[in-house]
């Protein structure tokens, strides 16, 4: 086992504090509308330019092991805030830095660290309650657009696109962010259910100009098996031909003789057919087939429940207003499934989301809900260069997380104002002893730090602006973009309650642990390898230097 280096008391805390400040100082330059960028060097390719706090934090590793421990703990604050609300990482870092700095001053002055922590925790619990009271629901498109704009660093186009996307696919819909091909940001909305499986044969194409298959009011046959024998399909094909409607077959696979016969029938115009593979694999495929069945009002033909393909009739098939199939995707528009059945299925999947343990499963289940309930919107980010594209994409993703958080828990006045107001409400809060009261004061003073940092980044004097904001009331605050005072809600400067709450809770949690640190242990740096010349026996080798 490697030898350890151990530091106690003030020695340990000073080193840790230095690490905290290095990381926090790098992150906090990005806060607010006039925050600057940070350039991150990459081992290959162009450097990354970002204004995203957590991206900066993740890049920082310090040489000194003790300082690095401090930096890593603050990194944890940013990561946790990012995981919980998807935004507010810089605010969380600024709060943590302030609590740690003020808290360690109090420890150095002889206060009891455990009581300080209890005081900080008490103040944060009270602050979260007050934040919830200040919170107003965020339901209309205008408020959603404002939240998106603020989170995307005052980029109004992004805010409006996110609001439009939420309007189109609903609050529960899936909105994904992709790299676009042009200079402009675009929004693509896919209504209906779309899955990533295209036609099994190009001979099914009936719209050569778009290279797609379009079926109007088709019957939809869903089979949880491979179909290779045409005899299994004949009864279905005859019934559909009599009904005079097209047919879409969604099965595990359609191959060999069965596929060839379908192609021949289509080309001769006997019956309009298209076949696609079922989406997903294994159990997920079964579940997605069932989703399509619920959406279209059909039944999945599965041998597991004793159903045979030969005996399937028109009553077992789903129907939709229209189906569009391209090389890679199939979109089912306006399925004829019953509303009650669809909402029941959505509720069932939501329950599975709550029980899911992995993020991947949760994401896939969320996609299924969206496909059943709303639709899917794709935000395509436009930029002139790849470096700008990466930076902008990260900002758009942040803005999207922020708007989701706003819809979930509402919004409060932005620009650091909500925390200043909350701190003012808690001036009468008291702990069980004087040390706890100091802890409460530490937390309340830290709540001003985001506002101070926003003002500082805008090149103004933090104390002057903070006092002016404190003298006001309600949503009165300072707009760093235009350098004027007024109602933050009217300015359209809103922060999601969830983002502000998460930032405060995680900052206080980690900062409290750092204040109560008394000892730090790390591996000793490995010394240089011992010089072979010092071994005695090989000393005579020194004379070989002349042979070079």
UniProtKB/Swiss-Prot annotation:
It is found in: Cytoplasm. Keywords: ATP-binding, Chaperone, Cytoplasm, Isomerase, Nucleotide-binding. InterPro entries: Chaperonin_Cpn60_CS, Cpn60/GroEL, Cpn60/GroEL/TCP-1, GroEL-like_apical_dom_sf, GROEL-like_equatorial_sf, TCP-1-like_intermed_sf. It holds the Pfam family Cpn60_TCP1. Signal peptide: none annotated. One of its GO terms (biological process) is protein refolding. GO terms for cellular component: cytoplasm. Its EC number is 5.6.1.7. ATP binds at residues 30-33, 51, 87-91, 415, 495. Coiled coil: none annotated. This is Chaperonin GroEL.
């Amino acid at each position: 086992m490697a030898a350890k280096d151990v530091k106690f008391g003030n020695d340990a805390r000073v080193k840790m504090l230095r690490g905290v400040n290095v990381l926090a100082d790098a992150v906090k330059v990005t806060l607010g509308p006039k925050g600057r960028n940070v350039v991150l060097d990459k081992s290959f390719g162009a450097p990354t330019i970002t204004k995203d706090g957590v991206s900066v934090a993740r890049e920082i590793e310090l040489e000194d092991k003790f300082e690095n421990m401090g930096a890593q703990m603050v990194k944890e604050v940013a990561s946790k805030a990012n995981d919980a609300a998807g935004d507010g990482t810089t605010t969380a870092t600024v709060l943590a830095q302030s609590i740690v700095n003020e808290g360690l001053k109090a420890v150095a002055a002889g206060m009891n660290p455990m009581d300080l922590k209890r005081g900080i925790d008490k103040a944060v619990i009270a602050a979260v309650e007050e934040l919830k009271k200040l919170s107003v629901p965020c339901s209309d498109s205008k408020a959603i657009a404002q939240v998106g704009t603020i989170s995307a660093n005052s980029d109004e186009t992004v805010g409006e696109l996110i609001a439009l996307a939420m309007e189109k696919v609903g609050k529960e819909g899936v909105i994904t962010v992709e790299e676009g091909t042009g200079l402009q940001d675009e929004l693509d909305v896919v209504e209906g259910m779309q899955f990533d499986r295209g036609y099994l044969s190009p001979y099914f194409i009936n719209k050569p100009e778009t290279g797609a298959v379009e079926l109007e009011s088709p019957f939809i046959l869903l089979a949880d098996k491979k179909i290779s024998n045409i005899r299994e399909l004949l009864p279905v094909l005859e019934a559909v031909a009599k009904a005079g409607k097209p047919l879409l077959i969604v099965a595990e696979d359609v191959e060999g003789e069965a596929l060839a016969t379908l192609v021949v029938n289509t080309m001769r115009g006997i019956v309009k057919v298209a076949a696609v593979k079922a989406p997903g694999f294994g159990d997920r495929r079964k579940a997605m087939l069932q989703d399509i069945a619920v959406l279209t009002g059909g039944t999945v033909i599965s041998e597991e429940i004793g159903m045979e393909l030969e005996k399937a009739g028109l009553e077992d098939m789903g129907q939709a207003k229209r189906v569009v199939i391209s090389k890679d995707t199939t979109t089912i528009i306006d399925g004829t499934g019953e509303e009650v059945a669809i909402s029941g299925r959505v509720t069932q999947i939501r329950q599975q989301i709550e029980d899911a343990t992995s993020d991947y499963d949760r994401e896939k289940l969320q996609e299924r809900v969206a496909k059943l309930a709303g639709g899917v919107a794709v935000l395509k980010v436009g930029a002139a260069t790849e470096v700008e594209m990466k930076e902008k994409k990260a900002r758009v993703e942040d803005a999207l997380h922020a708007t989701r958080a706003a819809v979930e828990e509402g919004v409060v006045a932005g620009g650091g104002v909500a925390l200043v107001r909350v701190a003012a409400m808690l001036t009468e809060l008291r702990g069980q002893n004087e040390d706890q009261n100091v802890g409460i004061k530490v937390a309340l003073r830290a709540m001003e730090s985001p506002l101070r940092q926003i003002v500082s980044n805008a090149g103004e004097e933090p104390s002057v602006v903070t006092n002016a904001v404190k003298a006001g009331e309600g949503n009165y605050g300072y707009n760093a973009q235009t350098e004027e005072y007024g109602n933050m809600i009217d300015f359209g400067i809103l922060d999601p309650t969830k983002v502000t709450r998460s930032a405060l809770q995680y900052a206080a949690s980690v900062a409290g642990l750092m204040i109560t640190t008394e000892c730090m242990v790390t591996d000793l740096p490995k010394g240089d390898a011992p010089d072979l010349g010092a071994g005695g026996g090989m000393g005579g080798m020194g004379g070989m230097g002349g042979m070079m």
